Amino acid sequence: MRITVVGSINLDLVATAPQLPAPGETVTGATLARHPGGKGANQALAAEKLGAEVCLIGRVGNDAMAGEALALMEEMGVDLSGVEVDVAAPTGVALIAVDPSGENQIVVAAGANHGVTPEQLPQRIEGALIVQLELPVETVEAAVGRATGFVCANLAPARPVSE
């Protein structure tokens, strides 16, 4: 099955801490890890692991974080021909604090993800399409309008879309 994912690509910086900070509070973290992330990238990796032929459409910066964000997808066989490099914006980054129970706080600096436009999309998207709302809404709406098959929309982060 062919799946196209139109979505975000981030580098996740995950810090574990004994507790999450209250507003204005600083806590000392225990560990820091760097992982590929972004809802789109995560969806592409999951679909690839399940045996689908996956193409990811997104945008990264012209920086070292892009290489880290894309390396695992490339290794897993995700088609990255739809990923463009933005020379004016950095790769998206998610700063994630996690406590021992798994509760988390996340701040996303979208960076190049906000530069994905309808012009970057193919005129027809064959097979299944997966989208989410970490890209500009007009790009997500254009992708859905060009899809010829099943569409799976993860409406997160929640925000208004047209019908």
What are these regions (language model features)?
Residues 1-9, 71-85, 96-163:
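Ribokinase/PfkB-type carbohydrate-kinase core domain
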Residues 1-59, 64-68:
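Glycine-rich phosphate/adenosyl-contacting loop at the front of the ribokinase-like
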Residues 6, 31-34, 57-62, 80-91, ...:
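Beta-strand->loop->alpha-helix junctions that form or flank phosphate-binding loops
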Residues 15-26, 71, 91-97, 148:
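Short charge-dense sequence patches
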Residues 20-23, 64, 90, 112, ...:
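Flexible domain-boundary/linker segments
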Residues 50, 76, 89-92:
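Short, basic and Ser/Thr-rich N-terminal targeting/leader segments
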Residues 66-67, 92-93, 163:
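Short Asp/Glu-rich motifs
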